[in-house]
Amino acid sequence: MLISNVGINPAAYLNNHSVENSSQTASQSVSAKDILNSIGISSSKVSDLGLSPTLSAPAPGVLTQTPGTITSFLKASIQNTDMNQDLNALANNVTTKANEVVQTQLREQQAEVGKFFDISGMSSSAVALLAAANTLMLTLNQADSKLSGKLSLVSFDAAKTTASSMMREGMNALSGSISQSALQLGITGVGAKLEYKGLQNERGALKHNAAKIDKLTTESHSIKNVLNGQNSVKLGAEGVDSLKSLNMKKTGTDATKNLNDATLKSNAGTSATESLGIKNSNKQISPEHQAILSKRLESVESDIRLEQNTMDMTRIDARKMQMTGDLIMKNSVTVGGIAGASRQYAATQERSEQQISQVNNRVASTASDEARESSRKSTSLIQEMLKTMESINQSKASALAAIAGNIRA
């Protein structure tokens, strides 16, 4: 039940505070004019009663006669029976109609199950504006959060790409080093083998052919000495032909010796020592022997030349093999470097991809930080707007409480 105080202008109160329906789909408001018309009081009559909600501007100054005039008017109005009856009738009708409207609204609210009570009309327009701004900032906050999450994923993907690229770079560098070392070692081994084989061949030539050449050279010198010795044969000492006899000593009872199947005859008139006569050596070589020696000398010299040519060819081949092996060993570093350069090129490409991934990671991380900062600022602004809305609602509630207190008074 509503309590009405005749000291309050009912028309002004009901005109400023209308009752609205809580339904969002079919809202209905009742003004003071409708209530007064329903009880038979027109606008002109309300104006005559001084109950018009229109307020006039206050006087520029309060006169000393004003309080007395107001007091006199109130006393006269209280003593006026017709006015008291009209005011009582108006208060009763307003109370009745207001109770009916409230009961109707309550019944409609109870009938509408699942619908919320609409309090949008109870707030000021500033609150509605702040609510719209709050919704906008909330949308921006959600967009910043989603953007920050996606940028974080991009940064994480870039980090994973960088890590995998670093692994591939390491594998390329390792495989390049292994292939370069293996190829270089293999080529060096081939060159060393060729050089060693050349040394062995040269050693064999010096060992076999040189020995044969020395032997044949010695024989050739001997034959030449025989042929060029002016038809003389030297048996290791000069003046051998001056020896004419060889004395033999007598030993034991047997004083005879058999030399070259020649019997030594004893001479009774000589001493005990017997002598053997020696003829002069033949200093001339027969033409047959000279021809044989000359032929042999030619054969020996031919063999010497053949062995020398064979040794020279063998040594040339050996030197060629040594030079080939040495060249292969010297070029093994170059060939190994070429083989490892391909892997180094792949590793360089991986490093370039790493740099690109690192740049993407930094850009995504920076953008994600900026998005998070924007989201944080949006959240702070939303909180500030909520505080402002709460302050406005508190001010509105205080005003409504003051009005309700005035009504109860």
Curated annotation (Swiss-Prot):
It is found in: Secreted; Host membrane. Signal peptide: none annotated. GO terms for cellular component: extracellular region; host cell membrane; membrane. The chain crosses the membrane at residues 119-140. It holds the Pfam family IpaC_SipC. It is a single-pass membrane protein. Residues 350-368 have a biased composition (Polar residues). Residues 350-378 are annotated as: Disordered. The keyword Transmembrane applies. One of its GO terms (biological process) is positive regulation of protein localization. Keywords: Host membrane, Membrane, Secreted, Transmembrane, Transmembrane helix, Virulence. Component of the type III secretion system 1 (SPI-1 T3SS), also called injectisome, which is used to inject bacterial effector proteins into eukaryotic host cells. SipB/SctE1 and SipC/SctB1 are inserted into the host membrane where they form a pore and allow the translocation of effector proteins into the cytosol of target cells. Belongs to the SctB/SipC family. The core secretion machinery of the T3SS is composed of approximately 20 different proteins, including cytoplasmic components, a base, an export apparatus and a needle. This subunit is involved in the formation of a pore, called the translocon, in host membrane. This is SPI-1 type 3 secretion system translocon protein SctB.
